[in-house]
Amino acid sequence: MAVYAVGDLQGCLQPLKCLLEQVAFDPAQDQLWLVGDLVNRGPQSLETLRFLYSIRHALTCVLGNHDLHLLAVAHNIERLKKGDTLREILDAPDRDDLLDWLRLQKLVHHDAERQITLVHAGIPPQWSLAKALKRAAEVEEVLRDDARLPLFLDGMYGNEPAKWNKDLHGVTRLRVITNYFTRMRFCTADGTLDLKSKEGVGSAPPGFAPWFSHPQRKMRGEKIIFGHWAALDGNCQEPGLYALDTGCVWGGAMTLLNVDSGALHRCTCPKQ
C-alpha cells in the first residue's frame, strides 16, 4: 500500500487525475491524503467533489477555508463571491450527499504509525500536537452537529480575535481555532495572527514570521504536510515540513508527495 498526499485542488480535477496516473494510484489498496481547499476557483468543483466521494474509502481529507466557505454558502449564511465556482455544487441533485460527506472531514489528521500530521494552513507555534488535535476536535464536533452548525458558520468569518486564549468561548473560540488551521500564514511566537499578508516569506509584517519558522515552535522536528500558501511554491526550508500548495489554480502546478518515500511528482496547470 502506498500513501500519497496532494496539495490544494481548488476544483482542478484533471491535474489530480494526471498525478494519480503517474503513480498508478489504486484506490483498492492505496491511500490519498488531501490538504483541503478541494473546491473553488477552478473549473470542475462539482466533478472534483464527485470524484473524491467515489473514492472516499481510500481518502483522508482535512478542510480548508474554501471548503468551509462552500458549507456557509450552502447553508445560506454567506453569498457567493466574485470568482467562486461553486454554483454547480449548490444546484446538483446529489449536493446533500456531497456536503454531508464534506462536513465529516477533519481539520487536523495525525497518522501515528508514520508520525506525520496533515493540516490545511498550519499548526500555531504555541500548540503541541496534542493541543492541536484537541482544539481541532472542538470545531469538528460542531461541523457534525445539525443544531450548532449554522451558528458556527455565521460567526466563522473575521480576523479577530487574532490570538488564542484558553478563556475564549462560543463562536469566538471556534473562529480563532479555525483561522489557525485554515487561514494562517504569518504569526508571532505567541500565535498572534496577521491574516492580511498573503505573499511569500519575505512579505512578513514587522514582528511577524511564517508560522513554521519560530525557533520555539512546539512541533519543531515533527513532520507536517500542509497547503494553503501558494506563494511558497513548495519551499519552506524547514526539515520535515512539506508545503504542497504550488499554485495549480493560478497557473502553477499540482504537487503529489509519496508520504513514505518523500518522492515528489508535479503536473503543470493552466491558469484558471
Curated annotation (Swiss-Prot):
Its EC number is 3.6.1.41. It comes from the Bacteria. The keyword Hydrolase applies. It holds the Pfam family Metallophos. One of its GO terms (molecular function) is bis(5'-nucleosyl)-tetraphosphatase (symmetrical) activity. Disulfide bonds: none annotated. InterPro entries: ApaH (IPR004617), Calcineurin-like_PHP_ApaH (IPR004843), Metallo-depent_PP-like (IPR029052). Keywords: Hydrolase. The keyword Hydrolase applies. CDD domains: MPP_ApaH. It catalyses: P(1),P(4)-bis(5'-adenosyl) tetraphosphate + H2O = 2 ADP + 2 H(+). Belongs to the Ap4A hydrolase family. Hydrolyzes diadenosine 5',5'''-P1,P4-tetraphosphate to yield ADP. This is Bis(5'-nucleosyl)-tetraphosphatase, symmetrical. It comes from Ectopseudomonas mendocina (strain ymp).
